Structures are given as C-alpha cells and as structure tokens.
Design a protein with these regions (language model features):
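Non-catalytic positions within long, well-ordered alpha-helices that form the structural scaffold/packing
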Residues: 22, 84, 158-159
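Helix C-cap/helix->beta junction micro-motif
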Residues: 24, 59-60, 89, 160-162
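Acidic/histidine-rich catalytic cores of soluble enzymes
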Residues: 47-155
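Structural motif corresponding to the early beta-alpha repeats
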Residues: 1-48, 58-63, 99, 104-106, ...
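Flexible, glycine- and charge-enriched loops at secondary-structure boundaries
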Residues: 3, 7, 11, 39-43, ...
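C-terminal helical cap(s) of enzyme catalytic domains, especially alpha/beta-barrels
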Residues: 177-196
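Active-site clefts of carbohydrate-active enzymes
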Residues: 129-142, 163-177
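A structural motif
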Residues: 21, 26, 129, 162-163
C-alpha cells in the first residue's frame, strides 16, 4: 500500500501468519502485493513491505513468497525487480500458471491488461521460486488444459532446477472442484512423463 502506516499495519498482521507457519511446520507463507496501480509507488511500497516482513520471517526461518496474483505482481519483470532489489534469501516467488491480469476494469470486472506470454512469465519468476501453483480452468477431451500447455510449463519448471512442491488450483466451472483438482493432478503426472 502506498500509505506507510497502512502498509506497516499489514506487515504487523502478516507477522501472525509467519508465527502460525512456524507452529504448523511450514517453510513459507504466500502474500499479495496489492495496494496501488501506480507503478513507481507500487515498486517502493512492495520493496518496503516485503523487506520488513521478510526480515521478521528470516528470524523465524520462514520464506515470504509473492504469487503473481493481479496488478503489478502479474508483471514478472516488475515483480522480479522487487525480489532482486531486496536480495533476501527468504523472499521469493510462487509462480502461478494462470494469474496474469495486470489491470481489471472496475465496472465489468474483466481483465483489460494481461501479461501475454505466460511461459516467459514463469521462466522469469522461476529463479526465485520456492513453490509453484499449477492453475487450471478447463480441460479438453484428452484431459489437457485448454489455455495452458502443461508440458511446456513443467519443462520450464524442471529446467529452472526447481524440485519442490507444485500445488494445484482448479478455477474452472465445467466440473466440480474435487474433479478439477484430480484432473489437474492427472494432467501434471501425464505431462511430467513427456518432459526432456
């Protein structure tokens, strides 16, 4: 948030998440970097807020991960500028295969500015990844995601040297949530068999 008091309040609230993560035995928490649509303000605010929270989390051996989750966080060059500027070993990314909307229309709630190359975006974010989210929306008759080439995505993940967890998120409406998660899991397993 561009207002430092509001931002500091958010950091304080998120410290409870860090403490909970310690008790639960987690390695990371995922955060958003919302608050402003003005690029320079966002960069400054994101660096400040993430830096403060990551400093606290480092004392607890917890990672702070930013997901591409709308706004400037869905512009991987800008997000990685923040991550690289902070240069903190416990401040990284959680690349999501499907969250690339940079700007929404307030009235229609539709995306009006989207980062176009999902694959390049994932590749840019992977060097700082400490978790990955396999997003899916809909599947064709062969079980492939209709918008995202999972073999291509997983090859990028593999080529980055990543060997951690890949979470699953199904956001489609054609099948139920449980069925969507299972279909995404099956797609991941099948895609993994086709990697170089």
């Amino acid at each position: 948030h561009p207002d430092e008091k509001v931002r500091d309040n958010a950091v304080e609230r998120h410290k409870r998440w860090v403490d909970a993560a310690v008790k639960l035995g987690c390695h990371s928490i995922r955060v958003n970097t919302n608050g402003t649509v003005i690029k320079d303000l966002w960069l400054t605010a994101a660096e400040d807020g993430l830096g403060k929270l990551s400093t606290y989390a480092a004392s607890k051996n917890i990672n702070i991960l930013v997901e591409n989750h709308g706004g400037f966080s869905s512009d991987p060059e800008k997000l990685m500028h923040v991550i690289n500027t902070l240069n903190m070993t416990n401040c990284g990314t959680l690349p999501d295969f499907g969250n690339w909307c940079i700007k929404w229309d307030k009235k229609t709630k539709k995306c009006v500015v989207e980062y176009k190359d999902y694959y390049k975006g994932i590749e840019i974010m992977m060097p700082a990844a400490k978790a990955v989210s396999a997003k899916s929306y809909n599947f064709d008759k062969n079980g492939n995601e209709t918008k995202i080439d999972y073999v291509k995505m997983l090859q990028i993940v593999k080529d980055s040297g990543y060997n951690g967890y890949i979470g699953i998120e199904y956001e489609g409406e054609e099948i139920g949530e449980k069925e969507g998660v299972i279909a995404t899991r099956n797609l991941l397993l099948n895609a993994a068999k086709r990697l170089n």
